[in-house]
UniProtKB/Swiss-Prot annotation:
A cellular component annotation (GO) from this entry: mitochondrial inner membrane
Topology within the bilayer: Multi-pass membrane protein
Chief subcellular location: mitochondrion
The keyword Mitochondrion appears for this protein: yes
A GO molecular-function annotation: NADH dehydrogenase (ubiquinone) activity
Presence of keyword Cell division: no
Gene coding for it: MT-ND2
InterPro entries in UniProt: Complex_I_Subunit_2, NADH_DH_su2_C, NADH_UbQ_OxRdtase_chain2, ND/Mrp_TM
One GO-annotated biological process of the protein: mitochondrial electron transport, NADH to ubiquinone
Protein name, UniProt field: NADH-ubiquinone oxidoreductase chain 2
UniProt enzyme class: translocase
Residues that span the membrane, as ranges: 1-21, 25-45, 59-79, 96-116, 122-142, 148-168, 200-220, 240-260, 274-294, 325-345
Length: 347
């Protein structure tokens, strides 16, 4: 793709997200979603092949359906209130339809089927954008309407997402699908706390984006896409492999690492609001995520035959791509937990 055209498309995608996040008018918010959707399609098809074409088509159809539901919700609200402003209280029916539209855009269960297929069909940089940047606009809309969200609907979708995000990733050998199911589970955690403490949902989103970006950047340094290539990476780039494994443990929510912080704070907040069954169910189903990350670590690092590293290293190494962002992101992915006393100010 021509670099100038790619820059224009990327700018349009970012501008669309910015319009959604800053808009106080439902029509301009819908325009922002459309700009973002139409701009990301060429990014998903940057490396053109039948798989990326299929993935882009699935993504387009899903997002177009969600945009249609968004306009339906806005129209219902307009008929009842006569207002276009996002700050006005929503009609209950409009609130439910709008929540379903944003759930479809985020990939929450039961609208999660497109996420693994689309992520698997595109190359790693596009997958990174899909699982990080594309979550910002729908989450900002849910943040704005959080006082009017139907609590039962949101909790049902959240717990389903956490469970399906864990079950779906159990037998995966493709790392992009693993990250997709991890994304579904993390979205479930974010939306579970949205009605009680929206700021905490944004904290969870920030930590999720840091962890996912770190993981994808380490995959991109050596074009690692399968469990097999991850196990081969150990002899070629032991440091990068260690970063991948530690970041995966953090994504799973292992206590000493950064990924444990949002889960801990969300469970604490839910129990303060006299909700006991939901956080218990969420904590138990989150173990499924940790299990499939542990399975990846076991198959890639702990099943190697004992040998000196220098005896099995390749004599001819490919040039690895370096990135300046990887070092600070790795630190953030593993060491945010000591900052948690300051984050208690969010409560």
């Amino acid at each position: 793709m021509n670099p100038l055209i790619f820059s224009i498309i990327t700018f349009t995608m970012m501008l669309g997200t910015g319009i959604v996040m800053t808009s106080s008018h439902w029509l301009t918010m819908w325009i922002g979603f459309e700009m973002n959707m139409l701009a990301i399609i060429p990014i998903l098809m940057k490396k053109y092949n039948p798989r990326s074409m299929e993935a882009s088509t699935k993504y387009f159809l899903t997002q177009a359906t969600a945009s249609m539901l968004l306009m339906l919700a806005v129209t219902i609200n307009l008929v009842h209130s006569g207002q276009w402003s996002t700050t006005n209280p929503l009609n209950p029916a409009a609130s439910i339809i709008l929540t379903l539209a944003m759930a479809m855009k985020l990939g929450l269960s039961p609208f999660h089927f497109w996420v693994p297929e689309v992520t698997q069909g595109v190359h790693l940089p596009s997958g990174l954008i899909l699982l990080t940047w594309q979550k910002l606009a729908p989450m900002s809309v849910l943040y704005q309407i959080s006082p009017m969200i139907n609590l039962d609907l949101m909790f049902t979708m959240s717990i389903l997402s956490i469970a399906i995000g864990g079950w779906g990733g159990l037998n995966q050998t493709q790392l992009r699908k693993v990250m997709a199911y991890s994304s579904i589970a993390h979205m479930g955690w974010m939306t579970a706390i949205l009605a009680y403490n929206p700021t905490m949902a944004l904290l969870n989103l920030t930590i999720y984006i840091i962890l996912t970006t770190t993981t994808f950047l380490t995959f991109m340094t050596n074009s690692t896409t399968t469990t097999l290539s991850l196990s081969h990476l150990w002899n070629k780039e032991p440091l990068i492999t260690t970063i991948i494994l530690v970041t995966m443990l953090s994504l799973g929510g292992l206590p000493p690492l950064s990924g444990f912080l949002p889960k801990w704070m969300i469970i604490q907040e839910l129990t303060k609001n006299n909700s006991i069954i939901a956080p218990t169910t969420m904590a138990i189903t989150a173990l499924l995520n940790l299990f499939f990350y542990m399975r990846l670590i076991y198959s890639s690092a702990l099943t190697l035959f004992p040998s000196m590293n220098n005896t099995v290293m390749k004599w001819q190494l490919n040039q690895t791509k370096s990135t300046a962002l990887l070092s600070p992101l790795t630190i953030l992915s593993t060491m945010i937990l000591p900052l948690s006393p300051m984050l208690m100010l969010l409560e």
